């Protein structure tokens, strides 16, 4: 199986996990020494190993994503495959009754080693910090998507 097919399978399993919190389903996708790195939007962190990665992602989902009734993911560029790396741009639009839609823009990079994710990175567009602060002020909502 090629890495893009692996990643698409992982992404599908991630969406299932988003719904049911069964993180064991994702464990086979990650190397034991995998790293997840987040850059931008004041969320900068580096999580090492599947246990820490899943705990950090779950924290962010519980405190941010799952507070919205709607979450729509759109790939805006790529995926670009180069060797063992895959890169793509995306926008996730969040919605909840009584609030303006909140578009979160960024990029992801995944690197594979021996068929498993060795590195997963998310970085947010440079203007997202300003956009998020303005959205929060207009909607009287405090956003907390921290992973650590």
Each language-model region and where it sits:
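Short, low-complexity N-terminal intrinsically disordered segments enriched in polar/charged residues
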Residues: 1-28, 32, 138-148
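A beta-strand edge to alpha-helix "cap/lid" segment located at domain peripheries
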Residues: 3, 61-148
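Short hydrophobic/aromatic segments of transmembrane alpha-helices and their interfaces
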Residues: 18, 35-36, 100-101
